[in-house]
Swiss-Prot record:
Belongs to the pantothenate synthetase family. SUPFAM superfamilies: Nucleotidylyl transferase. (R)-pantoate binds at residues 63, 155. It is found in: Cytoplasm. This is Pantothenate synthetase. Homodimer. Gene3D superfamilies: HUPs (3.40.50.620), Pantoate-beta-alanine ligase, C-terminal domain (3.30.1300.10). GO terms for biological process: pantothenate biosynthetic process. NCBIfam families: cyt_tran_rel, panC. GO terms for cellular component: cytosol. The active site is at residue 39. InterPro entries: Cyt_trans-like, Pantoate_ligase, Pantoate_ligase_C, Rossmann-like_a/b/a_fold.
C-alpha cells in the first residue's frame, strides 16, 4: 500500500472533512520525520484508538536555536513513507513552510512557567516554536486525539497545557518511551551519533536508573545529583545541561521522591545533545 502524501492545507482539509462527515474519529501523530520505532509505537496507539490516522512530517524551523542544528536534522521522507505503509496510515501531511507559516505570519503561542525550566532554560524560544506549530497542526488536522511520546515529557506537558488553556477540542495522549535493547531512548538524533558515541550513549540511562533506585529507597537527591554529574563526565558526556528531579504534575524541583516524580537529564555527547527522563518510585 502507498500512503497518500498531502502537501497542502486544502488537500488535508478535503480529506478530514470527508472523514468527519462519515462520523469517523481522527488521530494525529506530529513528527519531524526520521521515523524510528518510538514514532511507530505512537502510530500503533493512534491506529488502535481512532478510525483514521494522520502522521505529520514537518521539520519546524521555529523550534531550532541554531541554524546548523536545523540544517543537520535528518530528513528521510521516502524511508518514512515505507515504514508508515506497514501501518496502513490514512495520510501523511508533509507541508512546506508556506503552508504552516505563510508570508506575514506573526503569531506566537507561548506557555508560561513550565517552559522556563529543563530544555526551555537551555533552548530559549524552543517551546514557543513547539506550541505554535502544534497549535497549527491541531487546527489544520481537526484531529480528535494526538499522540506524543513521554521521551519528551516536558513537551508533552506543554502541549497538554496549551490545548487545555486554548480550549482546543483534542485529547493529547502520552505514550511510553521506546528504548533500544541497550536502554538508549529512541530518538531521530541518535542517527547523528558516531559509532563510538553510540556505544557510549546508553550510560546516561544506566546512571539515571541507579539514581532512581536510590531515590525510591529514600535517598536525598543532592548527593545523588553530584555523583551522577561526575559519572556522566567520566562516561564522556560534556556540557551537562541538567540532571534534575522534578514533580510529574508541575515540573517543580524536588529534593526527595516524596511525590510522583521523574528524573530528567540532558547532556552533549560528541556534539549531539541527548535527553532522557524516567519515572521515579515514591520513596518508601
Amino acid at each position: 500500500m502507498t500512503v497518500p502524501v498531502l502537501r497542502t492545507l486544502s488537500a488535508l482539509r478535503s480529506a478530514t472533512r470527508e472523514w468527519h462527515l462519515a462520523g469517523e474519529t481522527i488521530g494525529v501523530v506530529p513528527t519531524m520525520g526520521a521515523l524510528h520505532d518510538g514514532h511507530l509505537s505512537l502510530v500503533a496507539a493512534a491506529k488502535s484508538a481512532c478510525d483514521r490516522v494522520i502522521v505529520t512530517i514537518f521539520v519546524n524551523p521555529k523550534q531550532f536555536n541554531k541554524a546548523s542544528d536545523l540544517a543537520s536534522y535528518p530528513r528521510t521522507e521516502e524511508d518514512d513513507a515505507r515504514k508508515l505503509a506497514r501501518f496502513d496510515v490514512d495520510a501523511v501531511y508533509a507541508p512546506d513552510v508556506s503552508q504552516i507559516y505563510p508570508e506575514g505570519f506573526c503569531t506566537n503561542v507561548s506557555v508560561a512557567g513550565m517552559t522556563d525550566v529543563l530544555c526551555g532554560a537551555h533552548r530559549p524560544g524552543h517551546f514557543d516554536g513547539v506550541a505554535t506549530v502544534v497549535t497549527k497542526l491541531f487546527t489544520q488536522t481537526s484531529a480528535d486525539k494526538a499522540f506524543f511520546g513521554e521521551k519528551d515529557f516536558q513537551q508533552l506537558m506543554v502541549v497538554q497545557r496549551m490545548a487545555r488553556d486554548l480550549d482546543i477540542p483534542i485529547e493529547v495522549v502520552g505514550c511510553p518511551t521506546i528504548r533500544e535493547e541497550d536502554g538508549l531512548a529512541m530518538s531521530s538524533r541518535n542517527l547523528l551519533l558516531s559509532d563510538r558515541a553510540r556505544t557510549m550513549a546508553p550510560r546516561m540511562h544506566e546512571i539515571m536508573q541507579e539514581a532512581a533506585t536510590a531515590l525510591g529507597q529514600g535517598a536525598p537527591f543532592d548527593a545523588l545529583q553530584a555523583t551522577a554529574l561526575r559519572q556522566l563526565t567520566a562516561a564522556g558526556f560534556t556540557d551537562v545541561d541538567y540532571f534534575e528531579l522534578r514533580s510529574c504534575a508541575s515540573l517543580s524541583l524536588l529534593d526527595h521522591a516524596s511525590v510522583p516524580a521523574r528524573l530528567f537529564a540532558a547532556a552533549w555527547l560528541a556534539g549531539v545533545r541527548l535527553i532522557d527522563n524516567i519515572d521515579v518510585p515514591v520513596a518508601r
